[in-house]
Swiss-Prot record:
InterPro entries: NAD(P)-bd_dom_sf, ODC_Mu_crystall, ODC_N. Keywords: Arginine metabolism, Lyase, NAD. It catalyses: L-ornithine = L-proline + NH4(+). This is Ornithine cyclodeaminase. Its cofactor is NAD(+). GO terms for molecular function: ornithine cyclodeaminase activity. One of its GO terms (biological process) is arginine metabolic process. Its EC number is 4.3.1.12. Catalyzes the conversion of L-ornithine into L-proline with release of ammonia. Pathway: Amino-acid biosynthesis; L-proline biosynthesis; L-proline from L-ornithine: step 1/1. Belongs to the ornithine cyclodeaminase/mu-crystallin family.
Length: 358
């Protein structure tokens, strides 16, 4: 991917993103993206970190997620509106920008609705690689909406999970998930309750959408030795797990100041001890210590993961042509003459309007 004129910014549309993902292959894309996510967790201390800037309403939330490693800057605009599906709209939509810190000029503008689904699943699988039981093959997925297939494929690509136990309040959502994963190499069981779904599961993924303090999992459903991948709780007042599960588990988070506001641990005292995922990945602390330990990844999504996704797409776009050249920036030849640029364009328009018709 080249950027010959600084005023021209490569733009990846939804169509181009889908073509890129399919050209690479979904599982390969997830595996390679997970590598970028893990690489950036390993250099965690290089990043400028802040909780996302959120605007909450009774309908949902709109957020900005910025971060920088000192060389590149990235941000994502993302919403979360659980009731949107009732109107035929997506629960989550997003776009993102990658920029050069030295000049402040953007280098990439891309859709991130599809990319966020991929990066969320890739991050969950990275965490599970360090926290799940060894040789885990069976995963329960509670909530079979837009994120469920991505989670399944990421865990297959990165951990070798090949048995799925699915449950959703809406049987049509489960049927959709099964239909979409046909031929992907899974042994799938559609379950009639959460209790049935978690039976025999090594990994339990909760990925529901309702903006409420729900109790998707209760303490009696969680046996020793499992890994819980809690994805659905991602804003104040939205949780999925009973508090007793948290107190039995070793909890791992992305960025504590954000997770204490938005994650499952919002149910616990502010000083409740948690572990940071980057410290596990870098070997500073242990992840899974024994076979009976319950590990919990309290996932809310953090800006460094979007940064990783933006870096990956930038690198993957090279020589593909899967982007448009967007005339985004007013960049006059004389930087101090922005108004003159406007006047010159006016003259150009006038000359074009007076040209005789061919």
């Amino acid at each position: 991917m080249t950027q010959p004129n600084l005023n021209i910014v490569p733009f990846v549309s939804v169509d181009h993103m889908m073509k890129l993902v399919l050209r690479v292959g979904v599982e390969t894309f997830l595996k390679e993206l997970a590598g970028y996510v893990e690489e950036d967790f390993r250099r965690w201390q290089n990043f400028d970190k802040t909780p996302r800037v959120a605007s909450h309403s009774k309908e949902g939330v709109i957020e900005l997620m910025p971060t920088s490693d000192g060389t590149l800057y990235g941000f994502k605009y993302v919403n979360g509106h659980p009731k949107n599906t009732r109107d035929g709209l997506q629960t989550v939509t997003a776009f993102g920008v990658l920029a050069n810190v030295g000049s402040g000029y953007p280098m990439l503008l891309t859709e991130m609705t599809i990319l966020t689904a991929l990066r969320t699943a890739a991050t969950s699988a990275v965490a599970a690689k360090h926290l799940a039981p060894k040789n885990a093959r069976t995963m329960a997925i509670i909530g079979n909406g837009a994120q469920s297939e991505f989670q399944a494929l990421a865990f297959k690509a990165i951990l070798g999970v090949d048995k799925l136990r699915l449950y959703d309040l809406d049987p049509q959502a489960t049927a959709k998930c099964i239909r979409n994963l046909q031929g992907a190499g899974f042994d799938i069981v559609a379950c009639k309750s959460v209790e049935e779904a978690v039976e025999g599961a090594d990994i339990i993924t909760t990925v529901t959408a309702d903006k409420a303090n729900a109790t998707i999992l209760t303490d009696n459903m969680v046996g020793a030795g499992v890994h819980i991948n809690a994805v659905g709780g991602d804003c104040p007042g939205k949780t999925e797990l009973h508090g007793d599960i948290l107190r039995r588990s070793d909890i791992f988070v992305e960025y504590p100041p954000q997770t204490r506001i938005e994650g499952e641990i919002q149910q616990l005292p502010e000083d409740y001890p948690v572990n940071e995922l980057w410290e596990v990945i870098t070997g500073r602390i242990a992840g899974r210590k024994d076979a009976r330990q319950i590990t919990l990844f309290d996932s809310v999504g953090f800006a460094t993961e979007d940064f990783s996704a933006l870096r990956y797409v930038r690198d993957k776009l090279k020589d593909t042509g899967l982007y448009e050249q967007l005339d985004l920036l007013a960049d006059p030849d004389e930087p101090r003459d922005l108004y003159g640029m406007l006047l010159r364009h006016e003259k150009l328009l006038q000359s074009e309007s007076t040209k005789p018709a061919a």
